């Protein structure tokens, strides 16, 4: 009788971000001697055709590049009983190591043994969450990809709201890579996916959060691998309908509760319609498949904005948000010959939002929003897999992506200035600017994998490959009026009354700014940024006696960014042009608000990096049930294009600030008023100084990451995993004050020449919630060099993450499934709340105030000490399914902050610039917002005919128990001390002090019906 000696899975690093797996092992007789000439067949509904292998004298076999799915393995050899193993489940990027022992026989018979595949990816290095089709089918959640990411252990959403801006195990939200069917769809500027990922197209999602294999590019975050559905030998189609809306979705906050807070009501669905059609099947049985999808969604929500009259006496009414999305995909897989598999797919989408979703806020009226007028996305991919021999294959692919994103201003405010009240937090007038964004990307990769037996006494999986990628980001920006005007509690005079340096009269003193955005669409600000990457990698995964595997990998990357020539017309505000001529030009030598052109800048960021990556997997007891795992990686940062945006010679986001003395007292900014420039970086416009904007010796920062853990198969299909994750990074990139004349930074007191910074100590008075607090802030001296900033590594910026992850997975069998995790973690460092640039975004320049009450022990903005996620499904009689999904997350860390404006006479006497500064009054993490939790439920029923499901109906109840949370504004507002060392002065709290500025809590009931044919 044939005996299956061992079945256990080592999920090992995979080449080229491949979407496939490997099956390998050894065939022996009853005495353990290898068997040559054994014939293996590998079959699955997920695979085109049947693959085969003939063993050599070593008895070893291997099937590289196997499509994920459930497989049947058959082994035949004359004189031996035939062996069949069914239900071997393979996850993307995995290697299943399966050894067989065959028994001799004199008659033809079969020994059949059913075995389940692994319950959890057992990897030599990577820590990965696999969200398979069973989870995708039954999880109760909104039909969007961001909600799906919330199931991944260690995930923390930016602002605690499900989105694609997400951190995994302490990594920056901008450090993830989003990949669809081997095509990188990550926006090179903001580092989020360019398309909306359609959950109807998803077959599996693999999120690798630590221990990344060498084929994963230069990144420090998660590798989010979305595997789309493919066709099959049997035709299958579906028509799905999903709806929720008014009466089915409601706020859990009463009008009285909302009325007592700031207008921050949670958004509620007015209507949410989702229609999807899919069809897939054979072009020719075992030779070619196709899969197609068309999807239309229409969604409308209320917004938290309530009726309001702005300080210029304009009334603003409530408004709703609406979105429509049309998308389509077509995919073909062909196998024209036994050893060649080809793939082609195209994908397109079009999105329209009359109100751009990121602009929706309680403090922003309709006139201050933008219109997403038809965002288009296109993806095309070709790929081929060529099997050279039984143990060697070559995988090559190429992909192209293109996105356009037009964002015109709302017509109601397009010609107005932009207004912001620093006291109340209110916004009105024009939105940011009219913008036409574009993205293009091309990528190609090739990988060679070879399974080698008995090399130096052990078996090897040898991987070598390379990848090439180009990215382009374009922007065309203009705005009729470039004035940015600050109010304070309804008054245009931010600093009250002051003596004008021109007229010597007591007049209103305000803070205003002008951007350098052109005033006409005929001469917009045109910027183009390019990036090129070239990578190469090698890896050897050694198998020691089927008991341990060791992977040794090394990756090299070269990245180069370029700024194409930039041009712009003059701004549209006449006062800005006048101020530029009379105030800025005499000091700086030019008018930043006039027309300008700048030449191309090559090699803006040009760095090479080496990334060693190692992994270990050891079968503790030799049973294939318990594995000790560990990994070590040195992960370089991906430069992307975010840094180059911060280095643009002209930037749509750059605003030059001025003290505004309202000479005629009309409350309006005009040419007859007096203006004094803030000390800002006008040197950035000079080509001769441009190269000093970035450290010429800048190299890619690297994260030191190591993990250690244990996997245990508790029972068939049920696995447990414990993993400890350590990540640390020192010398994070920041933007610092820099003196180009002496080539020295001066962003800290200790590292600056004497007299550069003037200290000012004051005591911020007690408020309703907090005691009085003493703080020392720093103002630049009037004798300091002209403002200039440089991007460089900052020794004072660091981040550290320590986490313990416990996860469990019960695959869908015996009518139930379970997936969950508990993560205890601590995320600390100065690179977080202290330095947004360290998160890959444009940031304020670092000064000594950036480190007030900030230390390496401060909690970062992504710190969540405890997060719990559990999702399960039970199948009852009559094909009724009940699924529940629970999640809990600790509240975000925060700390009190205050904006301090020193007395004018003190500033004059001490030679200090009195521009306001904002600092923390305590270390971040001293306080936390409230934790959040929610429970979702789904009840569904399959209706079958002739043994096949024809209809599926379900109802979702999201936030079943009505959980809700709030964020209350208890910041200390603005402090105008009478002098140094005391606690007297004017303390102005924000207009929302003690009120909720964010409310979370809705309950939604949704219905869905799916017809299959």
Give a label for each model feature.
Residues 10-124, 198:
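Periplasm-facing N-terminal accessory domains of Gram-negative outer-membrane beta-barrel systems
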Residues 717, 730-731, 735, 826, ...:
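C-terminal beta-signal and adjacent terminal beta-strands/loops
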Residues 315-319, 459-621, 833-838, 845:
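Signature of Gram-negative outer-membrane beta-barrel scaffolds
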Residues 721-894:
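Gram-negative outer-membrane beta-barrel transporters
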Residues 80-106, 110-230, 258-268, 272-281, ...:
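Periplasmic N-terminal accessory/gating domains of Gram-negative outer-membrane beta-barrel systems
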Residues 158, 565-611, 615-793, 847, ...:
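Solvent-exposed loop/turn elements at secondary-structure boundaries
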Residues 267-353, 372-395, 555, 612:
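Transmembrane beta-barrel wall of Gram-negative outer-membrane proteins
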């Amino acid at each position: 009788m044939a005996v299956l000696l061992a079945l256990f899975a080592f999920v090992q690093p995979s080449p080229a971000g491949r979407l496939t797996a490997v099956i390998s092992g050894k065939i022996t007789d009853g005495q353990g001697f290898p068997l040559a000439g054994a014939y293996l067949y590998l079959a699955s509904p997920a695979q085109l055709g049947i693959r085969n292998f003939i063993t050599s004298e070593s008895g070893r076999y291997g099937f590289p590049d196997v499509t994920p799915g459930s497989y049947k393995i058959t082994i035949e050899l004359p004189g031996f009983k035939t062996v069949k193993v069914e239900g071997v489940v393979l996850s993307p990027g995995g290697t299943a190591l399966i050894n067989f022992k065959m028994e001799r026989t004199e008659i033809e018979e079969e020994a059949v043994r059913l075995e389940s595949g692994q319950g959890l990816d057992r990897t030599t290095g990577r820590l990965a969450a696999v969200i398979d089709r069973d989870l995708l089918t039954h999880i109760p959640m909104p039909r969007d990809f961001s909600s799906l990411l919330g199931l991944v252990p260690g995930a923390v959403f930016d602002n605690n709201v499900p989105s694609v801006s997400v951190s995994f195990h302490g990594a920056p939200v901008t450090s993830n890579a989003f990949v669809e069917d081997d095509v990188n769809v990550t926006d090179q500027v903001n580092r989020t996916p360019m398309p909306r990922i359609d959950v109807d197209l998803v077959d599996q999602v693999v999120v690798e959060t630590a221990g990344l294999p060498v084929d994963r590019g230069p990144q420090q975050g998660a590798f989010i691998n979305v595997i789309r559905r493919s066709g099959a030998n049997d035709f299958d189609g579906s028509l799905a309908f999903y709806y929720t809306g008014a009466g089915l979705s409601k706020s859990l906050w009463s009008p009285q509760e909302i009325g007592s807070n700031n207008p921050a009501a949670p958004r509620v669905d007015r209507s949410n319609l989702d229609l999807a059609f899919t069809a897939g099947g054979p072009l020719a049985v075992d030779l070619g498949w196709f899969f197609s999808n068309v999807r239309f969604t229409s969604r409308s929500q209320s917004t938290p904005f309530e009726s309001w009259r702005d300080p210029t006496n304009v009334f603003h009414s409530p408004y709703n948000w609406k979105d429509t999305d049309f998308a389509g995909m077509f995919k073909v897989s062909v196998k024209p010959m036994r050893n060649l598999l080809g793939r082609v797919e195209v994908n397109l989408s079009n999105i329209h939002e009359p109100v751009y979703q990121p602009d929706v806020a309680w403090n922003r009226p309709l006139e201050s929003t933008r219109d997403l007028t038809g965002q288009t996305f296109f993806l095309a991919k070709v790929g081929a897999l060529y099997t050279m021999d039984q143990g060697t294959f070559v995988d090559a692919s190429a992909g192209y992506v293109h996105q356009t994103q037009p964002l015109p201003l709302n017509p109601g405010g397009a010609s107005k200035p932009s207004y912001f009240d620093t006291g109340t937090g209110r916004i009105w007038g024009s939105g940011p600017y009219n913008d036409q964004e574009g993205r293009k990307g091309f990528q190609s990769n090739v990988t060679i994998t070879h399974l080698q037996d008995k090399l130096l006494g052990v078996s090897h999986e040898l991987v070598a490959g390379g990848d090439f990628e180009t990215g382009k980001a374009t922007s065309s920006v203009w705005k009729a009026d470039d004035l940015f005007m600050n109010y304070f509690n309804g008054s245009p005079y931010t600093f009250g009354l002051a003596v004008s340096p021109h007229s010597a009269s007591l007049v209103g003193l305000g803070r205003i700014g002008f951007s350098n955005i052109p005033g006409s669409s005929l001469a917009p600000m045109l910027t183009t940024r390019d990036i090129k990457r070239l990578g190469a990698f090698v890896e050897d995964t050694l198998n020691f006696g089927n008991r341990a595997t060791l992977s040794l990998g090394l990756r090299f990357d070269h990245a180069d960014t370029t700024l194409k020539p930039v041009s712009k017309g003059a701004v549209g505000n006449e006062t800005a042009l006048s101020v530029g001529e009379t105030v800025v030009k005499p000091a700086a030598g030019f008018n930043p608000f006039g027309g300008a052109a700048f030449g191309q800048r090559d090699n803006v960021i040009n760095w090479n990096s080496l990334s060693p990556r190692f992994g270990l997997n050891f079968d503790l007891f030799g049973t294939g049930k318990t594995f000790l795992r560990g990994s070590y990686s040195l992960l370089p940062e991906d430069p992307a294009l975010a840094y180059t945006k911060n280095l643009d010679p002209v930037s749509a986001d750059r605003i030059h600030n001025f003290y505004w003395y309202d000479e005629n007292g009309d409350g309006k900014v005009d040419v007859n008023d007096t203006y004094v420039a803030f000390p800002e970086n006008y040197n950035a416009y000079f080509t001769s100084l441009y190269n000093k904007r970035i450290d010429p010796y800048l190299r890619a920062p690297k994260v030191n990451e190591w993990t250690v853990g244990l996997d245990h198969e508790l029972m068939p299909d049920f696995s447990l995993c414990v993993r400890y994750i350590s990540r640390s990074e020192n010398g994070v990139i920041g933007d610092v004050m820099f003196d180009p004349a002496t080539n020295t930074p001066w962003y800290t007191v200790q590292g600056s020449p004497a007299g550069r910074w003037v200290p000012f100590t004051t005591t911020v008075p007690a408020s309703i919630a907090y005691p009085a607090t003493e703080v020392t802030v720093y103002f630049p001296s009037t004798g300091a060099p002209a403002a200039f900033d440089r991007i460089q590594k900052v020794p004072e910026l660091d981040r550290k993450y320590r986490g313990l992850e416990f996860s469990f997975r019960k695959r869908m069998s015996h009518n139930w499934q379970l997936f969950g995790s508990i993560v205890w973690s601590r995320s600390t460092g100065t690179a977080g709340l202290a330095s947004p640039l360290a998160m890959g975004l444009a940031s304020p320049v670092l000064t000594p105030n950036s480190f007030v009450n900030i230390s390496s022990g401060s909690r970062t903005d992504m710190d969540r000490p405890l997060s719990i996620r559990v999702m399960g499904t039970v199948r009852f009689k009559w094909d009724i399914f009940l699924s529940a999904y629970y999640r809990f997350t600790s509240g975000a860390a925060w700390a009190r902050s205050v904006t301090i404006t020193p007395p004018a006479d003190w500033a004059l006497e001490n030679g200090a610039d009195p521009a306001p500064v904002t600092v923390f009054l305590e270390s971040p993490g001293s306080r936390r917002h409230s934790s959040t939790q929610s429970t979702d439920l789904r009840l569904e029923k399959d209706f079958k005919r002739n043994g096949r499901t024809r209809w599926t109906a379900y109802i979702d109840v999201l936030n079943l128990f009505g959980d809700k949370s709030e964020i209350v504004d208890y910041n200390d507002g603005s402090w105008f001390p009478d002098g140094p060392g005391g606690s007297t002065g004017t303390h102005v709290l924000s207009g929302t002090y003690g009120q909720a500025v964010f409310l979370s809590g809705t309950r939604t009931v949704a219905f869905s019906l799916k017809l299959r044919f």
